[in-house]
């Protein structure tokens, strides 16, 4: 297993990396661009590539888990005008840090994956929208783009073929809302980053009103490995409906926080072993399995759960981006929720009234409980506000703010009640 600045990464996507071998020559030595070269030299049909992705079971790695091959098939192939391909590297959710490592340590995997996607969907222009707060990694990706252009893997008539693809990097300004695909498109167009109503969906009305396909960084980076390994073989790495591997960003109270790539369906207990177990030998109390928007799960339940979309959903949460936040027995759930609710209150774009007003209401109520001024009716009021936000906003940020509130109260109600009754925390030591 490779250690990169205390991050421990296992293949496929980040195989054999040492922190310095991110350049084009290094990537080619590892078999890089062989999938793209084979496609262009053999003239493989775009439909065959999309069929392979469907067979592979690859699902979007950004959070929604939508089947990638199916999404690519939505792009109208015979559209007479410009079409666009967009990568969402606007990684801003607390606990998530996998995509920045991909563009830092293996940027050419992303570039090759996007080029293959462009070929499969008949697209000639693409953009990678990179989160504003990862500036050094943005510069790294720009360097990789220059290398790919100079070597003929990007630009006009790639590798002497009739296929042309121009790929550009765009640096965002750090707004969490721009991780939502239509807000990202608005920002990319130079407008205020606010979500659009859907429908129409980006596949029919996307960037500049043109058909657009948007995928996450890890999703694109997986494509070359799928084609090199074989779609069926990639699928077999995981489990039914959960093909391949997934990078999990584990943080919190573990000995070795970092990025770990494991097959989907791997027991959570195995991931904990890879991360060195609980820090200081403490007991596991709670886990947020898919980024800060995913409902919290009690530690004992999570220890008996597998890491795949269906198993996590059955346990009452969602896999999301694969950002696993582990909390030990000393963590106060009220204070943890206070931090989460403040984040969503600050990051709401303000477009929808339920989210704009509701996130503030939830934050202030949790703040009141945490600081010893809670009232018994606050519990029902918090749930009521969350219920009136969820499903009533243009985008999923409202849901992302509401779900942690409901899950924390459901799974750790006793701590909230103790705070309200005794005016202090149930656990003796907390952040």
Predicted segments with their positions:
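Histidine-anchored nucleotide/phosphate-binding helix
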Residues: 106-120
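Hydrophobic alpha-helical positions that pack around
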Residues: 138-264, 276
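Conserved phosphate/anionic-ligand binding catalytic regions in large, soluble enzymes, centered on
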Residues: 53-74, 174-186, 190-192, 345-357, ...
């Amino acid at each position: 297993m490779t250690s990169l600045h205390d991050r421990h990464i296992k293949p496929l996507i980040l195989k054999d990396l040492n922190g310095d071998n991110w350049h084009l020559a290094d990537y080619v030595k590892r078999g890089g661009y062989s999938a793209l070269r084979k496609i262009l030299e053999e003239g493989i049909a775009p439909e065959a590539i999309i069929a392979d992705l469907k067979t592979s079971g690859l699902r979007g790695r950004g959070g929604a888990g939508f089947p990638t091959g199916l999404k690519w098939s939505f792009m109208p192939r015979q559209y007479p005008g410009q079409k666009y391909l967009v990568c969402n590297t606007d990684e801003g959710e607390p606990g998530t840090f996998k995509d920045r490592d991909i563009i830092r340590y293996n940027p050419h995997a992303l570039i090759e994956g996007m080029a293959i996607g462009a070929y499969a969907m008949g697209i000639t222009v693409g953009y990678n929208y990179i989160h504003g707060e990862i500036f050094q990694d943005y510069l790294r990706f720009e360097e990789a783009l220059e290398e790919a252009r100079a070597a003929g893997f990007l630009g006009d008539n790639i590798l002497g073929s009739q296929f042309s693809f121009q790929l550009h990097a765009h640096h965002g300004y750090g707004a969490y809302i721009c991780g939502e695909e239509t807000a990202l498109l608005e920002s990319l167009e130079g407008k205020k980053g606010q979500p659009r109503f859907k429908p129409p969906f980006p596949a029919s009305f996307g960037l500049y009103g043109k058909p657009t396909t948007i995928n996450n960084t890890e999703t694109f980076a997986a494509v070359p490995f799928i084609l090199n390994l074989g779609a069926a073989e990639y699928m077999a790495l995981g489990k039914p409906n959960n093909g391949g591997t997934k990078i999990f960003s584990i943080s919190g109270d573990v000995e070795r926080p970092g990025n770990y790539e494991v097959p989907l369906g791997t027991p959570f207990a195995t991931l904990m072993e890879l991360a060195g177990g609980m820090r200081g030998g403490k007991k596991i109390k709670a886990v947020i399995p898919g980024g800060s928007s995913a409902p919290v799960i009690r530690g004992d339940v999570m220890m008996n759960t597998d890491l795949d979309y269906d198993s996590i959903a059955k346990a009452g949460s969602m896999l999301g981006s694969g950002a696993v936040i582990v909390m030990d027995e000393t963590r106060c759930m009220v204070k943890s929720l206070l931090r989460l609710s403040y984040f969503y209150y600050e990051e709401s774009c303000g477009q929808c009234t339920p989210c704009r007003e509701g996130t503030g209401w939830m934050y202030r109520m949790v703040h009141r409980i945490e600081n010893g001024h809670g009232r018994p009716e606050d519990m029902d009021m918090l749930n009521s506000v969350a219920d009136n936000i969820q499903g009533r906003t243009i985008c999923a940020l409202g849901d992302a703010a509401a779900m942690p509130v409901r899950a924390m109260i459901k799974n750790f109600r006793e701590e909230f009640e103790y705070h309200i009754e005794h005016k202090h925390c149930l656990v003796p030591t907390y952040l």
